């Protein structure tokens, strides 16, 4: 079977995008792993199908590079917005996208060539109730600045869900931190029944943070949009920043704002890398 695809990236968080609005394309976990393979496939952090939706204009159906399904990807949903607009699936510059977190509204900003360059996403309200993050914890109070022990060392973390679970940890120097050693241990920690994405964060200045992310089912990625939203929420809850934050990641920069009304807004670029046809 031959499939048309488009490779896209949002500050280095790259996925293989497949338009399934006309044909109901479904792939097995093994096929998704094959497409995501950076040596023997197209290469990416996973595969995202763009489908028709009964609750929004389109649905984002997302899978990690290991073939497991995922609820949400902030960088991914920005690229979905660019895809549906640039490829003529909609003329609406404020399309609604159904995700595992619910229906999100995007605000598309086009450049001089008429193509989408920047996207702002209303990511909705963060989820802090432990049972909904989810995290195995006593009580219903948000898990803020609590202790997790890894390899005999204690780390303070805050648990936030942006439709997918995040564990935010502050370190002195995230760039020098052993993310690939500690990340997978926390990802699979008994605290987190559905595993967890882990953010390692250092403070660069006033309302300016640096983030590295270990994504569940994928490993370290150059960027994580929902992670940046979770980091912003955690930073405000811990009194480290104001409500509008610049977050630098290895792939680029995102601007996140947690508004007083509860919604988190994420702004960042979306780019198309190349497109083609693949035998699967």
From Swiss-Prot:
Xref: Pfam families: DAP_epimerase
Listed GO MF terms: diaminopimelate epimerase activity
Enzyme category, top tier: isomerase
Gene3D superfamilies for the chain: Diaminopimelate Epimerase, Chain A, domain 1
Compartment(s): Cytoplasm
Binding sites annotated in the UniProt record for substrate: 13, 64, 74-75, 164, 197, 215-216, 225-226
Keyword Nucleotide-binding in record: no
Site, as annotated: Could be important to modulate the pK values of the two catalytic cysteine residues: 166, 215
Biological process annotations from GO: lysine biosynthetic process via diaminopimelate
UniProt keyword terms in alphabetical order: Amino-acid biosynthesis, Cytoplasm, Isomerase, Lysine biosynthesis
GO terms for cellular component: cytosol
Reaction equation(s) it catalyzes: (2S,6S)-2,6-diaminopimelate = meso-2,6-diaminopimelate
Pathway field: Amino-acid biosynthesis; L-lysine biosynthesis via DAP pathway; DL-2,6-diaminopimelate from LL-2,6-diaminopimelate: step 1/1
InterPro entries: DAP_epimerase_AS, DAP_epimerase_DapF
EC numbers on record: 5.1.1.7
Active site positions: 73 (proton donor), 224 (proton acceptor)
Known function: Catalyzes the stereoinversion of LL-2,6-diaminopimelate (L,L-DAP) to meso-diaminopimelate (meso-DAP), a precursor of L-lysine and an essential component of the bacterial peptidoglycan.
Subunit structure: Homodimer.
PANTHER family to which the protein is assigned, alphabetical: DIAMINOPIMELATE EPIMERASE, DIAMINOPIMELATE EPIMERASE, CHLOROPLASTIC
Family: Belongs to the diaminopimelate epimerase family.
Name recorded for this polypeptide: Diaminopimelate epimerase
Organism of provenance: Leptospira biflexa serovar Patoc (strain Patoc 1 / Ames)
Gene name for this UniProt entry: dapF
């Amino acid at each position: 079977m031959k499939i048309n695809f488009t490779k896209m990236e949002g500050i280095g968080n790259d996925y293989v995008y497949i338009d399934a609005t006309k044909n109901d394309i479904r792939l097995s976990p093994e096929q998704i792993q094959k497409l995501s393979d950076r040596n023997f496939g197209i290469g990416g952090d996973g595969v995202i199908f763009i489908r028709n939706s009964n609750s929004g204009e389109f649905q984002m159906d997302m899978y990690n590079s290991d073939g497991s399904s995922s609820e949400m990807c902030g960088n991914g949903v920005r690229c979905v917005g660019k895809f549906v607009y640039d490829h003529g699936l909609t003329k609406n510059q404020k399309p609604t996208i159904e995700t595992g977190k619910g229906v999100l509204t995007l605000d598309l900003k086009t450049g001089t060539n008429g193509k989408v360059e920047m996207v702002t996403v209303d990511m909705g309200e963060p989820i802090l109730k432990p049972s909904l993050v989810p995290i195995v914890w006593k009580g219903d109070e948000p898990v803020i600045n609590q202790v997790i022990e890894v390899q005999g060392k204690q780390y303070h973390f805050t648990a936030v869900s942006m439709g997918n679970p995040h564990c935010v940890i502050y370190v002195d120097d995230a760039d020098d931190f052993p993310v690939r050693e500690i990340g997978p241990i926390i990802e699979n920690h008994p605290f987190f029944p559905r595993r967890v994405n882990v953010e390692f964060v250092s403070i660069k200045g006033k309302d300016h943070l640096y983030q590295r992310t270990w994504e569940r089912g994928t490993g370290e990625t150059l960027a994580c949009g929902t992670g940046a939203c979770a980091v912003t929420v955690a930073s405000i809850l811990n009194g480290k920043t104001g409500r509008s934050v610049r977050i630098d990641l290895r792939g680029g920069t995102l601007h996140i704002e947690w508004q007083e009304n509860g919604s988190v807004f994420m702004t960042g670029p979306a780019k198309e890398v190349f497109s083609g046809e693949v035998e699967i």
